[in-house]
Amino acid sequence: MKLSKLLFVLSAFCFSSVQAENLSIATGGTGGVYYPMGGGLAAVLSKYVPNMSATAEVTGGSVDNLNLIGTGKPYVGFSMADAAKEAQMGEGKFVNKKVDLRTLLVLYPNLMHVVTVESTGIKTMKDLKGKRVSTGAPGSATEIMAFRELEAAGLDKDKDVKRERLSVAESVNAIKDRKIDAFFWVGGLPTAAVTDLANSPGMKIVMIDNADEVAAMNKKYGDLYFPTVIPKTIYSGMAKDNKVAAVANILVVNANMSDAEAYQIVKTIFDHKLDLVRTHQEYINVTLENQKTKSTPVAFHPGALKYFKEKKLNLN
């Protein structure tokens, strides 16, 4: 009897340990920035956190990631701040499916790319009227922000453009095949798919300024967006710096994640930042100084706050 009880206890312990080890990183499409960053994060967590096995998953982007987190399963997700706010509030794409989120980290800014090629003649946001335009993949934060950009520019997403819903990689291929005229993509620098387009023979890339739309977007949706620049050195063939709208990227989890696990993830990211930078240069922008409550609409996880307190960090 004693032996059977012991075996039962050991079996239960082993089962719970296995469950605790598995963690999924919800990223984005293979042509974007979330995917390589998520792959790097999975590798670092698996290597340095005892008894943790993390795996990166290809997804449609922020909205998909937030829905996955909403299942309550062990997910860490990359998300844009505007999409996370909708999920937290149960608004927009998250009506009747509110997600109880917590922020682990403020990551880096996502910059809105409005991309075309010289042969289309498109030079401004207004020039998109009547054109074939991809506003991003279904289930992506690109789509949320693209709709807001069009609205702020005085364009109706359903009436004024011939809209496609493609990932960034699909959008690049569609531009090359002349099936669309322009596309929206919000991501880090550089984005591999956009680099591919810029380096394609016979294609001269044109990046459309969209920073003027920031004020109108913030007036309607809250202070989520800010103007910045994509330097002309980022993508081959750019004629000038590109003035764009940007939004913070955040790393989020379900509020049910334990304080200990959240703490360990945040600590490992900062302890092994150099390893992460080798997977994508946007990790350079993940700094303690950028961890501010004003940068995320979602409260920080208590486990993250414990780490920041140890570092004597002021979040205000």
Where do the model's predicted regions map?
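Ligand-binding cleft/hinge of the Venus flytrap
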Residues: L41-N51, G92, E143-V161, K176-K179, ...
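Short helix-initiation/N-cap motifs at beta->coil->alpha
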Residues: A56-N67, D156-K176, G188-A192
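A ligand-binding cleft/hinge motif common to bilobed small-molecule-binding domains
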Residues: G70, F78-F94, F147, E151-G154, ...
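C-terminal lobe and pocket-closing loops
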Residues: K204-Q264, A299, Y307, L315
